[in-house]
């Protein structure tokens, strides 16, 4: 039933956006920060990006920042899925961003495949980030600039953390 699906989607969105995440090892000892999440998406999308590539770049930004500073940028938790590490509730995050006119999140269907594009609709607010956070975002964006979605997925599958983690953990 469509109404039930809609209710569940709205309920999940409210839980995600209103939850007070206590800093833990799973979120990089950082409270969930919705504004930083969406501004990270805006920055990394740089107009338009494929969903798969965006989700990997978000993972690498949070994890590189954690490696260098013992905390993440966004407070997102990540899990292992077949195409690599992704933020928990990423569909909710992207759908909400689309509903709130922060991003355009749409499928692109070709004769051979279907994929999703994210296009930023807002201006990046660099004031939300520290100098160190901005440096990491820039480093990730530059490093993966010429990677396509498949290449970044393959790259992420070689990570020790990905190999050692069970699916959906």
Language-model features and meaning:
Residues 3-169:
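Domain-edge interaction signal
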């Amino acid at each position: 039933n469509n109404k039930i699906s809609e209710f569940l989607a709205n309920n999940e969105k409210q839980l995600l956006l209103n939850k007070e995440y206590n800093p833990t090892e799973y979120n990089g000892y950082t409270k969930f920060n919705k504004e930083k999440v969406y501004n990270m998406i805006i920055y990394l999308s740089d107009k338009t990006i494929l969903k798969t590539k965006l989700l990997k770049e978000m993972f690498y930004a949070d994890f590189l920042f954690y490696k260098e500073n013992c905390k993440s940028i966004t407070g997102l938790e990540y899990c292992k899925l077949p195409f690599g590490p992704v933020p928990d509730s990423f569909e909710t995050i992207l759908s909400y961003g689309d509903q709130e006119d922060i991003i355009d999140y749409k499928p692109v269907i070709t004769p051979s495949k279907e994929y999703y594009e994210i296009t930023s609709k807002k201006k990046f607010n660099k004031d939300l980030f520290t100098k160190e956070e901005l440096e990491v975002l820039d480093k990730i964006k530059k490093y993966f600039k010429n990677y396509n979605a498949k290449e970044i997925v393959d790259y992420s599958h070689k990570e020790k953390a990905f190999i050692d983690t069970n699916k959906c953990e």
